[in-house]
Amino acid sequence: MLKDIMVHLDLAPSCKNRLEASIGLAKRHGANLTGLYVYSSPRMNQPVQQSAEVREMFEQQVEGAGVSFDWLEVDIGFERVGVAEMIGYYTSFTDMLVVSQPLKADRDKQYSVITSPERLILGSGRPVLIVPASGTFPHIGERIMVAWKAGPKASRAMHDAMPLLQAAKHVNMVSVEKTTFSTGEGERLSRYLELHKVSATTELIPPGDLSVGDTLLNLVADDNIDLMVLGVHISTKRGQLDMGEIGRYLLGQMTVPMLLSH
């Protein structure tokens, strides 16, 4: 069960939609919503005023929705710790972290302090729900698609998403591969989910002319999916953290929220 959801708050235009999505998710699961605002006062012109603006926005929307909440405000200006590490520390006391799809324009204007979703996913120890930077998503988790490929990544993501799967009206386990589900794997997967009170379908999509990422995005549109679940492996590539070609592509082209798990 989801009991406490953490939403990262900042000054970016996408914060409003991210907060609305978090409130809807908290109401759906009867969870507490923790708002986390991380900032660096030496880099800001009016840190106290900006912090007050973010807090007022958060409390007004949450109180209006009738959701229980907590507020956390952290100044890392004089700490020897990065933003992702600080967010990860506080996320370890919650069930899920909600952030927005990162946009270069937000970073350039210093709206948002998040520069690496990979670092958040790797360091939080919790599933990370990424909300598209544009659009509204009031009903997250009614129709869920899990990108499945037998192995630790997909298994961890499925388990992390279990409270969402149990509350969903429709769950589809999708594999875009030639061999998956060929030896009764689909039946075992369905049976396992059934034992957890999840009624799911399994679907094997043979690889075609489209990439795996585009195939998954097409399925999202065709099946009216409102949440995609994806397991990713974070590795170091040329000195930078990298979540792989498929994860990177989906993060850039996402049309619905994605729950990512490492």
What annotation goes with each model-predicted range?
Residues M1-V48, G123, I140-P207, I225:
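Small/aliphatic-rich secondary-structure junction motif
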Residues N32, Y39-G77:
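N-terminal positively charged helical leader segments and presequences
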Residues Y37, Q101-P102, G231-H233, H262:
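Short secondary-structure boundary segments
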Residues V62-L97, K104, K197-M228, H233-L241, ...:
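Structural beta-alpha unit
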Residues T91-S92, I121, L165, D222, ...:
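A short, aliphatic-rich alpha-helical micro-motif
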Residues V98-P102, S124-S134, M258-H262:
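Short beta-strand elements of ligand-binding domains
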Residues Q110-G135, P152-P163:
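Active-site glycine-rich loop that binds ribose-phosphate moieties when present
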Residues S112-S116, E187, L217, D242-G247:
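Charged helix-capping and loop-helix junction motifs
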